[in-house]
């Protein structure tokens, strides 16, 4: 493979992996092969007409844009061709022994990153922004990277809502394991891709090869394990693979959008094994972390983002990291296009549709309804003067959630809880913060409520 082809297509894939949902990336983009057929054209080979139509309709424009950016050639063309990439002729690729070795090294590197490990080398602990919402998960991830197979965190089960950094952390752990042991057999794979590979291997009579491959790994990292739901044969195979790896003290890391016991249509024996090691939640980032993420991402883009602007965006958008990054990308793109300075007013105008939607998503009324339903009490109880523990604690949680998830002031929140004084709201927020650090049941309730309200 031409060295330029290797680096160009690898760079395209790495950037697309951050832009395209993981399941879609694994299914449609990762398997594609490419070749530079001329100085101004990248040819991408697709399996069949259906694949060609799908890639053309959904991803070709983005791929072309990336290729032009990476080559600096505004006329660069990306062409889709049905079929298998032809084997290169040696004399068309290299003219000297040194160039041949470079081409082979490049090919081996691409295969190692994209097809053998599946890891994104850009996702590291160093650029994973840490905050209270993910502090424990990151610390455990580093521990696993330094000591894979330790039964105190094997399997490691990371769970939380979409866009909170689970996939980034999963790659960071895998890259950390490889940094400590470059010969380790580490594989990252999305659960849906695992299912597809197993079905394909079974149909082709290659089930034994499939088993041998997965059971000889040193670390298996599976993203979005909830995709195994309802797939009984895949669950059976994974159950046996899990046992084999665990008994061999090989590391298993799984992610899901929910706590292991909450995943529906997964066999109980698998759920039990998911809980053998350590399950760690990743929560929606608190304000300080949201601001830090925005500042970090802007710095990576070479953009000087004022802290007050980052605070404004962080206060307004409270759901997940992916939304923050999307908002920041829109702001930067608009600023580059218009030549304007990024100010709070500029951001307010650029993101007016997102901000309006966010204001509608979480209200104090919504919070009260969700909390009341969760604790099986009435909304009127939250607004009453009832000080019994069964009502007072949910009321404090609801007040703290209102402060976390809305832009309302302490007096405004108090007014919406039966006219409570703002000092009562401040006390409630401080109390819940204290209990979250000392009482695991309160932390679990908080996490469950945050996930429900952020869904």
Swiss-Prot record:
InterPro entries according to UniProt: AAA+_ATPase, Chromosome_initiator_DnaA, Chromosome_initiator_DnaA-like, Chromosome_initiator_DnaA_CS, DnaA_C, DnaA_dom, DnaA_N_dom, DnaA_N_sf
Residues the record lists as binding ATP: 163, 165-167
Region of interest (Domain I, interacts with DnaA modulators), residue spans: 1-82
Molecular function terms from GO: ATP binding; ATP hydrolysis activity; DNA replication origin binding; lipid binding
Domain of life of the source: Bacteria
Region of interest called Domain III, AAA+ region, as start-end residue ranges on this chain: 118-335
Compartment list: Cytoplasm
GO terms for biological process, alphabetical: DNA replication initiation; regulation of DNA replication
Keywords of this entry: ATP-binding, Cytoplasm, DNA replication, DNA-binding, Lipid-binding, Nucleotide-binding
GO cellular component terms, A-Z: cytoplasm; plasma membrane
Region Domain II, annotated ranges: 82-117
Pfam families on file: Bac_DnaA, Bac_DnaA_C, DnaA_N, Hda_lid
Domain remark in the UniProt entry: Domain I is involved in oligomerization and binding regulators, domain II is flexibile and of varying length in different bacteria, domain III forms the AAA+ region, while domain IV binds dsDNA.
Family as reported in the entry's similarity comment: Belongs to the DnaA family.
HAMAP family assigned to the protein according to its UniProt record, in alphabetical order: DnaA_bact
Function: Plays an essential role in the initiation and regulation of chromosomal replication. ATP-DnaA binds to the origin of replication (oriC) to initiate formation of the DNA replication initiation complex once per cell cycle. Binds the DnaA box (a 9 base pair repeat at the origin) and separates the double-stranded (ds)DNA. Forms a right-handed helical filament on oriC DNA; dsDNA binds to the exterior of the filament while single-stranded (ss)DNA is stabiized in the filament's interior.
Quaternary structure note: Oligomerizes as a right-handed, spiral filament on DNA at oriC.
Name recorded for this polypeptide: Chromosomal replication initiator protein DnaA
